[in-house]
Amino acid sequence: MKSLQALFGGTFDPVHYGHLKPVETLANLIGLSRVIIMPNNVPPHRPQPEASSAQRKYMLELAIADKPLFTLGERELQRNAPSYTAQTLKAWREEQGPEAPLAFIIGQDSLLNFPTWHDYDTILDNTHLIVCRRPGYPLEMTQAQHQQWLEQHLTHTPDDLHQLPAGKIYLAETPWLNISATLIRERLEKGESCDDLLPENVLNYINQQGLYR
């Protein structure tokens, strides 16, 4: 049996501890040995990132250099059109074959918006969803049919993620750090310290490049 792999996508503008630490805790909780961290090139739901694709990629390489859990995925950086998660996960499934257990990691805020995503209802055909819980967000979807969808696929057993190739939603009790890329960009613009918010080598690179000023 192939071991469970997970994909963790985002803009990472810049990458910070709020991205990395909850996923590291998640990996320990559910026995996950490989996470592909995949930056968007052209995010469909957000404005263009301030840092270039090459700069965001390099910051990720610095951040995960001493973390064997993480592998950098460049699939979406190689695409100049908007990166839709459903398309990315479908292509990943085709590469890995029908039996490999695959998961996509999102935050609880993203789960609540999930029905607005492009082809959201196909995503569980190709992967599991692992949701990092966040305090202050409701546990229920806003519409009854979406709540029914959540309950239909919900599992409380991490073993299901390893034993089945796709189709389950798991709510993980991970630590929530009050850190956001927006906060970091604002503090850097004001010249305030960000030493405790992101890896030192990433911060050094940001300063060398004059990013977010």
Swiss-Prot record:
| Keyword annotations | ATP-binding, NAD, Nucleotide-binding, Nucleotidyltransferase, Pyridine nucleotide biosynthesis, Transferase
Fetch the Pfam families from UniProt. CTP_transf_like
State the encoding gene: nadD
Q: What is its EC number?
A: 2.7.7.18
- Family to which this protein belongs: Belongs to the NadD family.
* Annotated metabolic or biological route of this protein: Cofactor biosynthesis; NAD(+) biosynthesis; deamido-NAD(+) from nicotinate D-ribonucleotide: step 1/1
Task: Return the InterPro entries for the record.
Answer: Cyt_trans-like, NadD/NMNAT, Rossmann-like_a/b/a_fold
Keyword Lyase among UniProt keywords: no
Explain the purpose of this protein: Catalyzes the reversible adenylation of nicotinate mononucleotide (NaMN) to nicotinic acid adenine dinucleotide (NaAD).
Select a single GO molecular function from the record's annotations and give it.
Answer: nicotinate-nucleotide adenylyltransferase activity
TM ranges are none
Catalytic activity reported: nicotinate beta-D-ribonucleotide + ATP + H(+) = deamido-NAD(+) + diphosphate
The name this protein carries in UniProt is Nicotinate-nucleotide adenylyltransferase
Q: Which GO terms describe its biological process?
A: NAD biosynthetic process
